[in-house]
Amino acid sequence: MDDIYKAAVEQLTEEQKNEFKAAFDIFVLGAEDGCISTKELGKVMRMLGQNPTPEELQEMIDEVDEDGSGTVDFDEFLVMMVRCMKDDSKGKTEEELSDLFRMFDKNADGYIDLEELKIMLQATGETITEDDIEELMKDGDKNNDGRIDYDEFLEFMKGVE
């Protein structure tokens, strides 16, 4: 595994690490070894705004799965996310983020409320607890008004890019 990616992990903010950990934890629930299967990995990365192709995903897994377990622990996952962030260059464009915001904002009122967030996260097909959803809402809702406006959404997405 490239040391450059390991070094880049050290540059992640605590907030970025916490957001990655929250997404990782959603998928690791019930796993006895604290790792997620490579199958689940694509879902986690998509949830965090990354969209690797199956080939890119396999290539990343081959690089970070140092112990050959076929699963990815959190440290390996962080290295993967950093690599994906670097490969993604500047991340999502403003237009892509605007489209994503509109997908979440089902009633088109300019805000993402808890119910809209829950609907979108449950659409991933994974079992997500109310606590997980509320934690994500809390992370995104900087002014604590119970909903995420577009500026808060952009700020939140910067953290996951």
Curated annotation (Swiss-Prot):
Pfam families associated with the record? EF-hand_7, EF-hand_8
List, alphabetically, the InterPro entries matched.
CALM/Myosin/TropC-like, EF-hand-dom_pair, EF_Hand_1_Ca_BS, EF_hand_dom
Entry-linked PANTHER family: MYOSIN LIGHT CHAIN 1, 3, TROPONIN C1, SLOW SKELETAL AND CARDIAC TYPE
A GO MF annotation of the entry reads:
troponin I binding
Q: Which SMART domains match?
A: EFh
Protein species of origin = Gallus gallus (Chicken)
User: Additional info?
Assistant: Slow skeletal muscle Tn-C can bind 3 calcium ions per molecule. Domain I does not bind calcium.
Q: What's its job?
A: Troponin is the central regulatory protein of striated muscle contraction. Tn consists of three components: Tn-I which is the inhibitor of actomyosin ATPase, Tn-T which contains the binding site for tropomyosin and Tn-C. The binding of calcium to Tn-C abolishes the inhibitory action of Tn on actin filaments.
User: Entry's Gene3D superfamilies?
Assistant: EF-hand (1.10.238.10)
GO CC terms on record? cardiac Troponin complex
For this protein, the parts annotated as crossing the membrane are none
| Binding site residues for Ca(2+) 2 | D105, N107, D109, Y111, E116
Give start and end of each EF-hand domain: 16-51, 52-87, 92-127, 128-161
Q: Which residues carry this modification: N-acetylmethionine?
A: M1
Q: Which residues bind Ca(2+) 1?
A: D65, D67, S69, T71, E76
State the UniProt keywords alphabetically. Acetylation, Calcium, Metal-binding, Muscle protein, Repeat
Q: Per the similarity annotation, which family is this?
A: Belongs to the troponin C family.
Q: Which PROSITE patterns match?
A: EF_HAND_1 (PS00018), EF_HAND_2 (PS50222)
Q: Where does Ca(2+) 3 bind?
A: D141, N143, D145, R147, E152
**Mind telling me what this protein is named?**
Troponin C, slow skeletal and cardiac muscles
Give GO terms for biological process.
Answer: cardiac muscle contraction; skeletal muscle contraction
